[in-house]
Regions:
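Residue-level signal for well-ordered alpha-helical positions
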Residues: 22-23, 77-78, 97
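Short, flexible active-site-adjacent loop segments at beta-strand->alpha-helix junctions, enriched
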Residues: 14, 40, 68-70, 90, ...
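Non-DNA-binding regulatory cores of transcription-related proteins
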Residues: 55-58, 63, 68-90
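An N-terminal RHG(E/S)-centered segment typical of histidine phosphatases
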Residues: 1-4, 57-59, 106-108, 114-120
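Phosphate-coordination/substrate-recognition cap region in phosphate-metabolizing enzymes
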Residues: 1-60
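Domain-level recognition of soluble alpha/beta enzyme cores
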Residues: 81-117
Length: 120
């Protein structure tokens, strides 16, 4: 898999929760590792970045499931290859050299992957 995770944080929206359940099943993650977070029921880049800063440092790999335009903006913030839109059911993965989630807003990722078709 391109994605690995210890925990899935998801918006409380029905479609986001359903996506999280499918993702957990696909990645063999126990459903108890899905955490519903009302803070992720937002379309704001700033609010999602603030949530990321509060992730417990016991986790080194997390998945966030949420909403646009916030996730498109986060992808563009960390990637040199800008996109117009992160479509439904698409993802991007970031890797950082840090053990502290509160630091990543100021860091450049050491890798960036996505499952977007070219030209999106």
């Amino acid at each position: 898999h391109f994605i690995s995770s210890e925990i899935i944080y998801t918006s409380s929206a029905n479609r986001a929760l359903y996506t999280s359940i499918l993702l957990a099943k696909s990645l063999s993650i126990n459903f108890s590792k899905i955490k519903i977070c009302d803070e992720l029921y937002t379309f704001s880049f700033t609010e999602v970045m603030e949530f990321i800063r509060t992730i417990d440092n016991i986790y080194s790999n997390v998945v966030l499931v949420g909403h646009n335009p916030a996730y498109t903006e986060i992808s563009n913030y960390f990637s040199e290859n800008k996109i117009l839109n992160l479509p439904t059911a698409r993802w991007f993965s970031l890797k950082f050299e840090s053990d502290n989630w509160s630091d990543i807003i100021d860091l450049k990722p050491i890798s960036y992957l996505n499952n977007l078709k070219s030209g999106v």
